[in-house]
């Protein structure tokens, strides 16, 4: 999770993977030993960003596959990081980066018919998402995912979701610059270009 992030849903038939930009990786525990200068980007922040991206993929799924019987679906996501799980439901109060990401989450939820809920999963039961987070380079993602499908056959029907460049840019700015977006102003822009699913 310190170099890349990934997530999936068997029910919604998607998986995703992104490499964190160098400006984020340089500020993780891979390169900084402490937070004396306030520059460290914690794993909690990266896990929270990952949940937000998974919510975006879930929103894309529900908007692309509307159901007459469920006009207000809820994406029930699971995570193995208690801080990020709490931030999804209650918002972050201490971390400036967490608060900035909270505004991105807000922007994605305004006028969105898809709700969000989060449950806990033990790290030992989160092997697929952890595997997607450990792909070293995006160019290796397809072949690595093929090997994951061999280990976890339930992934066979999943397609790759690519978050929009605008979303990744806003998330990166929130993480690196603690940039606070105006949720009302950004909502329609983000919801109109969530990303796309590819084979």
Say what each PLM segment does.
Residues 55-134:
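RNase H catalytic domain
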Residues 48-52, 56:
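A structural signal for well-ordered alpha-helical segments within the folded catalytic domains
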Residues 3-8:
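Short beta-strand scaffold segments in enzyme catalytic cores
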Residues 146-199:
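A cross-taxonomic marker for long C-terminal extensions/tails that follow the last structured domain
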Residues 10-49, 83-96:
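A short, polar/acidic, helix/strand-boundary loop motif
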Residues 111-168:
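C-terminal functional segments of enzyme domains
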Residues 1-2, 51, 80:
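Two-metal-ion RNase H-like nuclease active-site motif
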Residues 100-104, 141-146, 184-187:
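Glycine-rich loops and low-complexity Gly/Arg-rich segments
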């Amino acid at each position: 999770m310190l170099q890349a992030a990934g997530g999936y849903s068997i029910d919604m038939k998607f998986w995703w993977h992104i490499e964190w930009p160098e400006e984020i990786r340089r500020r993780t525990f891979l390169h900084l030993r402490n937070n004396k200068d306030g520059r460290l980007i914690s794993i909690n922040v990266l896990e929270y960003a990952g949940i937000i991206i998974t919510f975006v993929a879930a929103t894309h799924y529900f908007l692309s596959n509307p159901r007459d019987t469920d006009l207000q679906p809820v994406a029930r996501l699971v995570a193995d990081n208690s801080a990020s799980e709490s931030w999804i439901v209650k918002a972050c109060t201490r971390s400036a980066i967490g608060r900035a990401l909270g505004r991105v989450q807000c922007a994605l939820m305004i006028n969105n018919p898809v709700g969000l809920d989060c449950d806990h999963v033990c790290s030992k039961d989160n092997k697929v998402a952890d595997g997607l987070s450990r792909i070293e380079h995006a160019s290796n993602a397809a072949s690595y995912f093929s090997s994951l499908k061999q280990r976890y056959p339930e992934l066979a029907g999943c397609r790759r979701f690519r978050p929009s460049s605008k979303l990744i840019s806003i998330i990166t700015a929130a993480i690196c610059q603690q940039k606070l977006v105006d949720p009302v102003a950004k909502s329609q822009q983000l919801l109109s270009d969530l990303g796309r699913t590819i084979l």
